[in-house]
Each structure stands twice: as C-alpha cells, then as structure tokens.
Amino acid sequence: MSNGIVAKRYAVALFKIAKEKHVLEMFEEELRLVQNVYEKNGELHSFLTQPNISKEQKKTFLANVFGSVSESILNTLYILIDNKRIDILSDIANEYVVLANEERNVADATVYSTRLLSEEEKLNIAEAFAKRTGKDAIRVKNVVDEDLLGGIKVRIGNRIYDGSLQGKLARIQRELMKNR
C-alpha cells in the first residue's frame, strides 16, 4: 500500500478522535509542531529511522521530546514507530490539516509577493479570496518571490490565481497571438 494512502488512514483516524473530543484545532497545532520539529531536526529524523535502536528507546525519546502533546498524538507516534512508518509523519500531518480545513470551511493560501506583506494586506487578501472561494476564512502564508516583477500570486490548494505582472504580460501576449 502506498505511503499516501496509509498516511490518509492515520489522518482520518486522528481526525475522528479530534472531532469526537472537540479538539480539531489543538490536534492540528500539535501535529504541525511535531511535523516541524521532525522535518527541521536531521538528528531526530536519523535517530527515529535507525534500525539498530530499539523501539522502546525511540518511544522513550519521543515521550521526552513531545511530552507536552496530547496522548492521542503521542500514541500515534508510538504506533508509527511500532509499524516502522515514522517517515510518513509529515504526510499524516498534511492530510489531517486538509480534513480539519474542510470541516471548518477554511483554506490555506500561499501568497507569493515581491516583498513581505503587512498584516492589513494579508487580511485584505484573505477576505477577498474567502469570498471568491466560498470559504469562511483563508489562512495566509506570505512567501517572498524575488523572481516576480510585481503583483502577487495566490495558491489555494492546487489552484493558482496569478495577479503578478509576469502573469498579466503573459495573458496579453496570448491575446495578441490569438488575434493575429
């Protein structure tokens, strides 16, 4: 079975537990924290994937590092260690966020711009795209892209809204070529 399918199953199980306990936000925050630490700490990743280190040592280590997370999240980490699937941790976290966002009618947007946007600009973008997409809210993550000439690009899920100067020039060029 592919890692994506397995990750989705774990995410669905966590989502059901979170929904039952009314802790969608908390689980999301904890999963993002665990994912962040796991992805950014090469030593942790290396330790957890070492075959010569016992499962019990790995679990004890996880309990020490992530002792502040909920029992359900910690137990999931233990199961991943037992099943030698800790490598799909990031996929599980990402799948969980998708499920939680769908439940709350929220979307995550990545906004590419030539400079960092102010909080007010992010709020305006979030409001505009919430209306456009029919979502209750949009969570904006700003990424500076120095390759843009001007304007912004917004990515929500697998959809890109291109309001960049490059995009506008490309559309004008296509129109001119079409009208020849």
From Swiss-Prot:
Give the coiled coil ranges.
none
Q: Which compartment or compartments is the protein found in?
A: Cell membrane
Q: Give the GO molecular function terms.
A: proton-transporting ATP synthase activity, rotational mechanism
Q: Which cysteines are joined by disulfide bonds?
A: none
Determine the domain of life of the protein's source: Bacteria
Q: How does it sit in the membrane?
A: Peripheral membrane protein
Q: Which InterPro entries match?
A: ATP_synth_OSCP/delta_N_sf, ATPase_OSCP/d_CS, ATPase_OSCP/dsu
Query: Does the keyword field hold Cell membrane?
Result: yes
Question: An example Gene Ontology cellular component term from the record?
Answer: plasma membrane
What family, per the record?
Belongs to the ATPase delta chain family.
Matching PANTHER family = ATP SYNTHASE DELTA CHAIN
Q: Function, please?
A: F(1)F(0) ATP synthase produces ATP from ADP in the presence of a proton or sodium gradient. F-type ATPases consist of two structural domains, F(1) containing the extramembraneous catalytic core and F(0) containing the membrane proton channel, linked together by a central stalk and a peripheral stalk. During catalysis, ATP synthesis in the catalytic domain of F(1) is coupled via a rotary mechanism of the central stalk subunits to proton translocation. This protein is part of the stalk that links CF(0) to CF(1). It either transmits conformational changes from CF(0) to CF(1) or is implicated in proton conduction.
Subunit organization: F-type ATPases have 2 components, F(1) - the catalytic core - and F(0) - the membrane proton channel. F(1) has five subunits: alpha(3), beta(3), gamma(1), delta(1), epsilon(1). F(0) has three main subunits: a(1), b(2) and c(10-14). The alpha and beta chains form an alternating ring which encloses part of the gamma chain. F(1) is attached to F(0) by a central stalk formed by the gamma and epsilon chains, while a peripheral stalk is formed by the delta and b chains.
Protein name listed in UniProt: ATP synthase subunit delta
Give the organism the record lists. Bacillus anthracis
